[in-house]
Amino acid sequence: MAQTERYKKWRQTPKGRETRNAVQKRYFQRMDPTNRKLKHIQGKWGSHVPLWYIQRFEAQKGRCVCEKELIFGATDVKSDQTCIDHDPQFSREQIKKSGKTNNPIYPRQLLCNMCNKGLGMFFDNPDLMRKHADNLENLKG
């Protein structure tokens, strides 16, 4: 049995899985937060999105639509994370696979966690958002 096959079998055992996970965790913790974020984006969104992320961050001047400052690198605080907003007609998997074609699909913009959740709650529906905004204005008197 070849060494790589033995290693693959060993990784399937509880001890092997635990050891490999610990090694991977140490590797990512030692990485620079910026590189860690870009590597995470590449794995989640595809190889064409990290460059888009850098360009979009610069185009938005490091700010969300709500003017909150965005964090470029990785952060352990979930509420501080910069979110990638995409058109709901395309899943993350479709965007990822499109990077291997001549016509890649890119996300829409970068948002703070709060704005990303808000858009999701309103199903990316501007009319619904306007109704609620108008309602809030009316409640203020």
Stretches with model-predicted labels:
Residues 1-83, 88-106, 110-141:
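Contiguous alpha-helical segments
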